[in-house]
Amino acid sequence: MKRFNIAILSLVSLALISAQVKAQQKNFNQLFTAGHANAFIGGLYDGFYPYWQLKQHGNFGLGAPDKLDGELVILEGKIYQTQHTGKTFEVDPKSLTPFAAVNYFHADKAIKLSTEYNKASLMALLDSITANSIGIYAIHLKGKFKHIKTRAFPPVNQKPYTPLAQLLNKQHFFEYKALDGDFVGYNLPAYMEGANITGYHFHFISAERNAGGHVIDFTTEKDMMVEIDFLDSFTVQFPQTNDFKSFDFKKDRSEEVKSVEIGKKE
């Protein structure tokens, strides 16, 4: 009996040590990116990184599905896909993403908005909070939106794929009123340009998890909650594909990125 108790205690100890090691492996201040933003914008839409593995690097984030089939949101450890039809659902963990960014979200600052904000005024408020030019910020908004406009792209099916800025006429827009939900996004510094989407970048998921997309425009209601997580490092997992190895990284795609972010050419 004594040996049995010792064996049980040994198993419990091993389990606790394993849990501690896993906890230590989680970097709560690090942004993880699978893929490369410029490569994705330039037409590398084939998924290479499985969702189940992506969730090992964070419980919060955004990205794109395989073959550009809509938009992704990662929230509370679950990954949701919104297709160009508007259909929104939790993904198959074995499916792949060509580009996604995640982190383990822990709010370092929280603000409850006392009035309505439109896109411009909210960005100005966030500018005052995320003023460090080298800072990496994960941003979560939760509450009711008076109005919100999102978009999603249809899937591509024939290679070579067309660069994303040339597919703006294919995007589908969705507009909602008086809808509860979450913004999931980032404000990333200029030195990350190319590898990721710099500046503000938000995706939306409704409270009912049946609507979403890349955020184009919005107006909040009062009492919106804003949470900001200050990150201090980032890591990137690049695809090991022939398409990636032969991609033209010398081309300046900054204007293409701007057009894709706002959903139109300026």
Q: Model-predicted segments: where are they?
A:
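Bacterial Sec-dependent N-terminal signal peptides
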Residues: 1-24
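N-terminal low-complexity or amphipathic/hydrophobic leaders
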Residues: 36-100
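A glycine-rich, hydrophobic loop/mini-helix early in the fold
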Residues: 82-129
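Long, positively charged binding patches that form subdomain-scale interaction surfaces
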Residues: 123-186, 191-195
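Histidine-centered divalent-metal-coordination microenvironment in nucleic-acid enzymes
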Residues: 197-205
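A hydrophobic, small-residue-rich beta->alpha segment in the mid-to-C-terminal subdomain
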Residues: 206-250
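Conserved catalytic alpha/beta cores of large enzymes that bind or transform nucleotide phosphates
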Residues: 247-266
